[in-house]
């Protein structure tokens, strides 16, 4: 079945509110129809209000880069999924390797966040991916499969069909190394196969799987030609309006 592509930029800890607004103003009027592709940017928490406000009359969707799994409480420094929904966010990125690595987030944390995100009417973009050691040991499929199963445990089939999975090999994030087209296809298919095993083929056929890891305007078309790659989660190339728009040239 045909799945609508989704291109999402992850700004990470970059841009102040003025820069975020300028970016949205530069790209908003130039984006293709939502019939063709969903386009989103994941802004830092400090930029979300500005980014959502600037994007509100356009087709650009806005993601948060993280949230907590409780709506309110004594959780200093955390972001409420309930408030993200009230602000007008569309997506929340969870399970990014930087969160797992630097902030010691576990599969259980990510699963709780996925449930909280759905409970508040938002859509999770659930990241998964292996280290270079795991890849070179030939254990990538097994490792990433376990991440996906754990992250989605206890969700309904309907919820899983509607979310986004982002496969990002850790060795390709910000390193300039990128997975080959075959690597990307094989791993995104492996991710989809886990969904099929856990939730059935119909759900697996609906869920969108992105590839991430040094995706650039020069290579996005190759990745998007893969039958099991439904989009891209893009870091560095999403920081400039020109290169972000150029990522959408794969449609032509």
From Swiss-Prot:
<keyword id="KW-0963">Cytoplasm</keyword>
<protein>
    <recommendedName>
        <fullName>Triosephosphate isomerase</fullName>
        <ecNumber>5.3.1.1</ecNumber>
    </recommendedName>
</protein>
<dbReference type="GO" id="GO:0006096">
    <property type="term" value="P:glycolytic process"/>
</dbReference>
<feature type="binding site">
    <location>
        <begin position="235"/>
        <end position="236"/>
    </location>
    <ligand>
        <name>substrate</name>
    </ligand>
</feature>
<dbReference type="GO" id="GO:0004807">
    <property type="term" value="F:triose-phosphate isomerase activity"/>
</dbReference>
<dbReference type="InterPro" id="IPR013785">
    <property type="entry name" value="Aldolase_TIM"/>
</dbReference>
<comment type="pathway">
    <text>Carbohydrate biosynthesis; gluconeogenesis.</text>
</comment>
<comment type="pathway">
    <text>Carbohydrate degradation; glycolysis; D-glyceraldehyde 3-phosphate from glycerone phosphate: step 1/1.</text>
</comment>
<dbReference type="InterPro" id="IPR022896">
    <property type="entry name" value="TrioseP_Isoase_bac/euk"/>
</dbReference>
<keyword id="KW-0413">Isomerase</keyword>
<feature type="binding site">
    <location>
        <position position="174"/>
    </location>
    <ligand>
        <name>substrate</name>
    </ligand>
</feature>
<feature type="binding site">
    <location>
        <position position="214"/>
    </location>
    <ligand>
        <name>substrate</name>
    </ligand>
</feature>
<dbReference type="GO" id="GO:0005829">
    <property type="term" value="C:cytosol"/>
</dbReference>
<dbReference type="InterPro" id="IPR035990">
    <property type="entry name" value="TIM_sf"/>
</dbReference>
<dbReference type="GO" id="GO:0046166">
    <property type="term" value="P:glyceraldehyde-3-phosphate biosynthetic process"/>
</dbReference>
<comment type="similarity">
    <text>Belongs to the triosephosphate isomerase family.</text>
</comment>
<keyword id="KW-0312">Gluconeogenesis</keyword>
<keyword id="KW-0324">Glycolysis</keyword>
<feature type="active site" description="Electrophile">
    <location>
        <position position="96"/>
    </location>
</feature>
<feature type="active site" description="Proton acceptor">
    <location>
        <position position="168"/>
    </location>
</feature>
<comment type="subunit">
    <text>Homodimer.</text>
</comment>
<dbReference type="InterPro" id="IPR000652">
    <property type="entry name" value="Triosephosphate_isomerase"/>
</dbReference>
<comment type="function">
    <text>Involved in the gluconeogenesis. Catalyzes stereospecifically the conversion of dihydroxyacetone phosphate (DHAP) to D-glyceraldehyde-3-phosphate (G3P).</text>
</comment>
<dbReference type="GO" id="GO:0006094">
    <property type="term" value="P:gluconeogenesis"/>
</dbReference>
<dbReference type="GO" id="GO:0019563">
    <property type="term" value="P:glycerol catabolic process"/>
</dbReference>
<feature type="binding site">
    <location>
        <begin position="10"/>
        <end position="12"/>
    </location>
    <ligand>
        <name>substrate</name>
    </ligand>
</feature>
<dbReference type="InterPro" id="IPR020861">
    <property type="entry name" value="Triosephosphate_isomerase_AS"/>
</dbReference>
<dbReference type="Pfam" id="PF00121">
    <property type="entry name" value="TIM"/>
</dbReference>
């Amino acid at each position: 079945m045909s799945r609508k592509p989704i291109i999402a930029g992850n700004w990470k800890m970059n841009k102040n509110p003025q820069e975020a607004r300028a970016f949205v103003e530069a790209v908003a009027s130039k984006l293709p129809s939502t019939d063709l592709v969903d386009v989103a940017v994941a802004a830092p928490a400090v930029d979300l209000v500005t980014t959502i406000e600037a994007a509100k009359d356009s087709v650009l969707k806005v993601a948060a880069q993280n949230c907590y799994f409780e709506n309110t409480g004594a959780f200093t420094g955390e972001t409420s999924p309930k408030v993200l929904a009230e602000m007008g966010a569309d997506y929340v990125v969870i399970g990014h390797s930087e969160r797992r690595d630097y902030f010691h987030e576990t599969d259980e944390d990510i699963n709780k966040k996925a449930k909280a995100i759905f409970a508040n009417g938002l859509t999770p973009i659930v990241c998964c991916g292996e280290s270079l050691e795991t890849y070179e040991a030939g254990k990538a499929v097994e490792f990433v499969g376990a991440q996906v199963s754990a992250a989605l445990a206890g969700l309904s089939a309907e919820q899983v069909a509607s979310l986004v999975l982002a496969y990002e090999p850790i060795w390709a994030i910000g390193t300039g190394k990128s997975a080959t087209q075959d690597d990307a296809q094989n791993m995104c298919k492996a991710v989809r196969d886990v969904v099929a095993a856990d939730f059935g083929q119909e759900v697996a056929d609906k869920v969108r799987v992105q590839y991430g890891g040094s995706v650039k305007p020069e290579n996005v078309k190759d990745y998007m030609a893969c039958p099991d790659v439904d989009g891209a989660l893009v870091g560095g190339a999403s920081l400039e309006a020109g290169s972000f728009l150029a990522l959408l040239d794969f449609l032509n």
